[in-house]
Amino acid sequence: MIWYVATLIASVISTRGLVAQGAHGLREEPEFVTARAGEGVVLRCDVIHPVTGQPPPYVVEWFKFGVPIPIFIKFGYYPPHVDPEYAGRASLHDKASLRLEQVRSEDQGWYECKVLMLDQQYDTFHNGSWVHLTINAPPTFTETPPQYIEAKEGGSITMTCTAFGNPKPIVTWLKEGTLLGASAKYQVSDGSLTVTSVSREDRGAYTCRAYSIQGEAVHTTHLLVQGPPFIVSPPENITVNISQDALLTCRAEAYPGNLTYTWYWQDENVYFQNDLKLRVRILIDGTLIIFRVKPEDAGKYTCVPSNSLGRSPSASAYLTVQYPARVLNMPPVIYVPVGIHGYIRCPVDAEPPATVVKWNKDGRPLQVEKNLGWTLMEDGSIRIEEATEEALGTYTCVPYNTLGTMGQSAPARLVLKDPPYFTVLPGWEYRQEAGRELLIPCAAAGDPFPVITWRKVGKPSRSKHNALPSGSLQFRALSKEDHGEWECVATNVVTSITASTHLTVIGTSPHAPGSVRVHVSMTTANVSWEPGYDGGYEQTFSVWMKRAQFGPHDWLSLSVPPGPSWLLVDSLEPETAYQFSVLAQNRLGTSAFSEVVTVNTLAFPVTTPEPLVLVTPPRCLTANRTQQGVLLSWLPPANHSFPIDRYIMEFRVGERWEMLDDAIPGTDGDFFAKDLSQDTWYEFRVLAVMQDLISEPSNIAGVSSTDIFPQPDLTDDGLARPVLAGIVATICFLAAAILFSTLAACFVNKQRKRKLKRKKDPPLSITHCRKSLESPLSSGKVSPESIRTLRAPSESSDDQGQPAAKRMLSPTREKELSLYKKTKRAISSRKYSVAKAEAEAEATTPIELISRGPDGRFVMGPSEMEPSVKGRRIEGFPFAEETDMYPEFRQSDEENEDPLVPTSVAALKPQLTPMSSSQDSYLPPPAYSPRFQPRGLEGPSGLGGRLQATGQARPPAPRPFQHGQYYGYLSSSSPGEVEPPPFYMPEVGSPLSSVMSSPPLHTEGPFGHPTIPEENGENASNSTLPLTQTPTGGRSPEPWGRPEFPFGGLETPAMMFPHQLHPCDVAESLQPKACLPRGLPPAPLQVPAAYPGMLSLEAPKGWVGKSPGRGPIPAPPATKWQERPMQPLVSQGQLRHTSQGMGIPVLPYPEPAEPGGHGGPSTFGLDTRWYEPQPRPRPSPRQARRAEPSLHQVVLQPSRLSPLTQSPLSSRTGSPELAARARPRPGLLQQAEMSEITLQPPAAVSFSRKSTPSSTGSPSQSSRSGSPSYRPTMGFTTLATGYPSPPPGPAPPAPGDTLDVFGQTPSPRRMGEEPLRPEPPTTLPTSG
């Protein structure tokens, strides 16, 4: 029994605890439940019952926050208590949960669940759980405006639209589908829309839209504006023909819509027009119908709708009635003034306007153009310049238009009348102050009496003025508006006449400017105007401007400087509308504003970019290496709307891309690259071109060219390229070798022929021009050398004269030949030293010629095997052999020892041996090098040695110098002194200077220098004196001007000085007795200013009886001469210099003149070649004078290898005095001695036209040295006082031509020669 009670108590206690825990500790945290409107939801609330036993009774209550009583109560098995709002929707779910069906938005909120245990005390115990219910609902309107809403025009109206939903919806307003935002016209706030200043444009449908994520709701309201009607379709202009019906439409809208329409014609109701009211009708929609229109119905029609609210609108249109042309109110009498122009008018009425008006006079058609002074005007009127009685008559007119005509006018009679005239004319100008009275007179008369009226030109005046009966114009108080032009008009039926005057009102404000113009740019505007009247005071201007959209109070004033009537306004906005006006002001006030001009500034130039058409690059570029090159392959671009035009292939080796090919067809997908460099890394890329657009480059493909180049081998296509190139090169080399071999063979053959021909040259002899003996020219046997050749000889021309085969020579000949070869070898050597030359001379110079005799012993002198045959000499010319060609010279000088032979000639005889004509024969050079002694610059009397006459005396004559028959030496040495060896004249190294037996048939020399006329009937000199520019330093000398050389003789060096150093200018004690006048023609000499003075050089006398070979003979210089050879010059009785250093006297011989003047002396030019005579030889371009035809020259031809020359015997009393000048020898002269050498110009040597030719080559000028550092100046000068002088020739060559010593143009230096230092030449006076 006790156990049972304890168990019962424990169970009760445990049950109470569980219930209390379930009721009090159930879900202490609130629960949130979300549901969509219209769906069902369960609000959970749990109760835990005991495991065993009977559950205690309890009560379930559900509360909603904000509602004081429970919305749901349930106890046991009793029916629940449900709030009316939840009736039918709330029920108990499970033990204590609440189930709500079809939830609503208002069901949202906090709910509390309470469970009450009936067996417990509730005073101190509370339990329950909280649940928040959220209802998601689409927007729904809770407040909306009515479907139609009215508003008065000019007022405001507000339309409100409220919506509810979860989440809260957003409310917006739209008008005709356009979203309305906050503005001056509309105000939108919290779903309300307010329209201010309602106008007719505000009428229409307005839509309220509420939307959220759950949906949207829309409501539409129509706004009706109460006001006057609004014309929706105004009437339009129409054109109808006469008698048709016209229809004018007019439709309007209004609220309220009780509309009435009224139509007006010319501002009068159509129903008030008597002729129109019966033919019009107005329909209910406002259309006006006019039946059977007439021309008078045309005009403006106006439609006015009305609904009794406000001011009714109106709209107008014009009715045009077309009809044929007609004449209205033709006057019966037409008055035309006399003496002035008048009109005959036809009052035409036509629609369309009349095109032709025809006139009839007195019932006949009138041809207006046939009447003088009559003109038919465009309106059909006739203008008469001056009416006469011929114009009198009756006129009718008939107008026509496109619709025809309504007939002719009524007849009108023309009457001539005098026009009115002014009896009082107003003045030209009137000036009066403002506010004062003014009277302007005007009066007229006529028949009928005219009526006088006044009018203002331009803007009419509104001031108080009136016209008096007399016609005058009266102003009681002048105002600013009275200023301007006024006209007095006198009118009667005949015509109207006018008279003008100008009225100036002083003391007013300025008048408004006019003609305002504005020129705009993007940011500037140039405003210009025409100033108005200033009112009598100085006025200024200001420009007013504003933006067009701004109000009337936004004008900005800009002052204008005094003077100009324009202003440049800057800082404007582009593409903006501006308004401009101009205002004038003076001391009395401002003018009215000018008209307002509105302009728009220019907009910035907008360049619309062309749409970019992107071309994708080619794809998948690959490079495959082959033996022939690199094969590049690619795929076309992936996207391209147009076909590919072409591809561009580029490559690079370094950093820079270069184009390989830019014309690969667009249809190709590969390219083969050839001719690549070996062992080089190449990178390639390709670009696509489509319609002038270039794509981006493709991917880069790299390849090395190491294995591209295989060994050259023979393929089917042919030989490899290197093999082919080698074959071509070999063929070219063989062809060139054959060509050069052929040329060399020809050259050698020609040289051999020249040597053979030279060996056949005859010995030199005196040639007489008058002899008719055969010569190589006259006999027809022309030597090949006589033919001119254009090829220059080689530099080795020194050896060209040697024969091809050796001859058997005598010991003397062998001696001469060996010495010649040795001497020439020494001369031709390029390296030279004084010590070497002396040593070689001592070692090689023989004392006597050694030869082997018959017994084998060596003997000196001539060999017995070859007995020496003493050659015969020409008398007076011991250096020339006698030949069979000229018998007049057969007498030898050995057989006839003339006691008159000069001592100098006798001394030279042992040195003169017979010579052959071959150039192989050569006299050994004398063992003496001339030493040049300086002489002072003195006259002839002051010289140490000079030429004197040693032959037989001539009759005394007044001459500046005395001459004998022969030349000799006059030395200052004492008798006891040892005479020096004979002077040696070296070989010039060129055959050009050798004597030519048959000179060219030129009447004058190639140099053309004038001769020096002789004083007192005698020639001073026949020689010409060309002089080269011989620089003394490295720079080219400045040539002297053309000096005037009055020559008195050539014995002294004074002839080389200009006139200020002439012997006539020295002291009287040193002057000769006679001196040539200075009026002689100037010699064409160009003497360099570098020569400090002139030194005379005399040759030493030879030793009598001594052989030239005895004694020490200095070796010739080894340096090769690089100056020009001696050139032949034209002169009579002078020495001719040969290639072996010979002077050849040229003797005159009288002969009758030949026709054409060709009998004179011929000259020997620089290009010494054989000349073939022609019937009429062409004159040389260098011809400067002609010789006298009565004189012919005799050329003395000595052996070309003779070292010295002697004077020939002359039949005349005097013989020429010769001055021989030797070539400078740079190898034997020191610098100190060179500066003292006298420069003597070479003389021109003349030759006979029929003399024996000399076998010499003619080297071209191209082989000459053209360097100005050294030029030869060797020559001979002769004073032939006993010979007549030829007349002077033409002028010398132009000053611009640079000439050498022989008048020739310098040519370039021979290749390979060393330039020689310039040395002045020497002068040698000789006599023979």
Swiss-Prot record:
Membrane topology, Extracellular segments: 18-722
> Which Gene Ontology MF annotations are present?
kinase binding
Q: Report the principal subcellular site.
A: membrane
GO terms (BP aspect): homophilic cell adhesion via plasma membrane adhesion molecules; nervous system development; positive regulation of inhibitory postsynaptic potential; synaptic membrane adhesion
Comp. bias intervals (Low complexity): 990-1001, 1246-1273
List the membrane topology term(s): Single-pass type I membrane protein
Q: Which residues carry this modification: Phosphoserine?
A: 775, 783, 794, 1207, 1215
An annotated GO cellular component of this protein is: neuronal cell body
User: Which interval of the chain is the signal sequence?
Assistant: 1-17
Q: Which residues carry this modification: Omega-N-methylarginine?
A: 1136
Q: What does this protein do?
A: Transmembrane protein which is abundantly expressed in interneurons, where it may regulate inhibitory synapse development. May mediate homophilic cell adhesion.
| Protein name, as recorded | Protein turtle homolog B
